[in-house]
C-alpha cells in the first residue's frame, strides 16, 4: 500500500479496507536507473505531443495526479474535447492502466437522462464506491447534461443507489475525478455559478496521422495546431510505461497534495463553451446597446 498521507510505501493493514488495486508493483522513480530514464523520456514526449503548451501540460499532469487522493478537493468535471485521432483515448488508457481497478467507465446516459425514481435500481452507480477515475465516452449531438447529477458526483455529498435484484441501498461519497471524452460537446442548460464552476473543457488540439500525411513543419496549415505521425505501438508502450507513470504521479502528488491549478487555455475554452450555451445572453450582448 502506498500511503499518501505519510508519503511512504508500507504493508497493507486490515483496517485499510482496501478491495481495489493498481495490479502492479510500486517502483519509485530512480533517475539513476537507465530504464526509468528512458521510459520517462518517452512519457514526457507523449505528454508534450498531446499538450504542446507548458501550462496545459502542467494542468494535465496535476489533474492526473489528483486522481490518486480520493479526496475530490477540486470538485471538477473535466471534458476532454477535440476531433478524432488526437490522443484523448490514449491519455485515458495510460492513466487507467496505471490506476488498475481504481479506474472505470460510466455510460453517458447516466448524466444525460433524468434521475431514476426513488428506490429504482441503478447498477451503474453501485460500482463506483472507492473508484478514483471515472471516464464517460462519446456523447451524441444534442445530448443534454443533467447538472444535478454532475453536482452530486463532484460536490462531496453522499450518493445512494441500489443494484439490480438487490433490496439493500449502497451509500457512498464519490472519490473520483470525473471526466468525459467527446468530439461533440453536450448541452448544459443551467446558467448558475454552481454548475459552471465545476466544468472544465480540456482541448486536445494535436492530431496524429499516417507518415505520409505529416506536414514538413508539423503544423496543420488550416488550424495551426501540431501534427505528428501516429505511433502504431503506443498500446504496447502504455503497458510498459504504467509503473513509471504512476511513480511520477506520486512524486507530483507529494508537491500538489491533489490540488489542480487552473490554466488560461482550459479556462478560455470553458468560457467559450459557457458563452455558446447561453443563447439569450449572446442575443443581449450582440443585439442590445446601452443608451
Regions found by a protein language model. Give the residues of each.
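Feature primarily recognizes SF3-like P-loop helicase cores of small DNA viruses
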Residues: 1-291
Amino acid at each position: 500500500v502506498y500511503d499518501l498521507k505519510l508519503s511512504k510505501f508500507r504493508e497493507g493493514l486490515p483496517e485499510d479496507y482496501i478491495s481495489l488495486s493498481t495490479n502492479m508493483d510500486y517502483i519509485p522513480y530512480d533517475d539513476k536507473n537507465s530504464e526509468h530514464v528512458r521510459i520517462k523520456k518517452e512519457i514526457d514526449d507523449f505528454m508534450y505531443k498531446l499538450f504542446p503548451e507548458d501550462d496545459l501540460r502542467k494542468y494535465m499532469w496535476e489533474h492526473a495526479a489528483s486522481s490518486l487522493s480520493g479526496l475530490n478537493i477540486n470538485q471538477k468535471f473535466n471534458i476532454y474535447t477535440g476531433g478524432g485521432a488526437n490522443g484523448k483515448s490514449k491519455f485515458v488508457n495510460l492513466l487507467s492502466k496505471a490506476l488498475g481497478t481504481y479506474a472505470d467507465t460510466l455510460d453517458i446516459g447516466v448524466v444525460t437522462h433524468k434521475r431514476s425514481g426513488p428506490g429504482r435500481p441503478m447498477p451503474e452507480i453501485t460500482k463506483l464506491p472507492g473508484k478514483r477515475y471515472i471516464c464517460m465516452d462519446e456523447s451524441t449531438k444534442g445530448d443534454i447534461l443533467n447538472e444535478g447529477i454532475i453536482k452530486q458526483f463532484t460536490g462531496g455529498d453522499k450518493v445512494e443507489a441500489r443494484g439490480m435484484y438487490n433490496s439493500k441501498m449502497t451509500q457512498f461519497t464519490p472519490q473520483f475525478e470525473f471526466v468525459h471524452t467527446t468530439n461533440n460537446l453536450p448541452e448544459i442548460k443551467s446558467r448558475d455559478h454552481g454548475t459552471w464552476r465545476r466544468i472544465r473543457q480540456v482541448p486536445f488540439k494535436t492530431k496524429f496521422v499516417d507518415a505520409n500525411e505529416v506536414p514538413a513543419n508539423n503544423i496543420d496549415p488550416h488550424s495551426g495546431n501540431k501534427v505528428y505521425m501516429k505511433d502504431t505501438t503506443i498500446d504496447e508502450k502504455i503497458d510498459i510505461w504504467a509503473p513509471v507513470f504512476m511513480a511520477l504521479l506520486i512524486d507530483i502528488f507529494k508537491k500538489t497534495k491533489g490540488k489542480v491549478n487552473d490554466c488560461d487555455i482550459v479556462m478560455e475554452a470553458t468560457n467559450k463553451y459557457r458563452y455558446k450555451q447561453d443563447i439569450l445572453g449572446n442575443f443581449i450582448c450582440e443585439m442590445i446597446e446601452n443608451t
